[in-house]
Amino acid sequence: MHTVSELRTFRSAAAVAGMSQEDIEDFVDHIAANPDDGEEIVGTGGCRKVRFAIRGNNKGKSGGVRTITFYTGNDLPVFLITVFSKSQKVNLTKAERNSLKKLTTAIVDEYAMRVQALAAGGERA
């Protein structure tokens, strides 16, 4: 199982998409065990779109939510970036993909700085 980290905006996006607390917990369990699940989104720096069925909609994955995750496998957690229902959005725009690329670069850079600081005996972690 991998560590999962939610970005600050993930919970509010999950509520808008209709996910319950149980849905979120189910998804976290799923993605912790399967961090490479979903299809990679070109131009995002490695984000993946994971289709996930939510409780009570009886439509399976196709009627569920689309969660955007980021996982590099380089000792970083799996990041839950955002989530949306199919009725909210089908695909990401070019501008959204570009924003995700900047975000994923910042995540990797920040973690690299933290590791270097820890290796040097610093306090930043």
What are these regions (language model features)?
Residues 2-5, 22, 63, 95-99:
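Charged, alpha-helix-enriched surfaces in structured cytosolic catalytic cores
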Residues 28-30, 101:
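Polybasic/polar functional segments that serve as interface/processing modules
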Residues 2, 23, 39-42, 92:
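Short, surface-exposed helix-loop/turn micro-motifs enriched in polar/charged residues
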Residues 17, 21-26, 33, 46-48, ...:
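Sequence/structural signature of beta-propeller domains
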Residues 71-125:
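Enriched for short, Lys/Arg-rich terminal
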Residues 1-23, 119-125:
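Arg/Lys-rich, positively charged N-terminal/basic patches that mediate binding to nucleic acids
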Residues 38-83, 88:
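Basic/aromatic recognition patch in beta-strand/loop cores that engages polyanionic ligands
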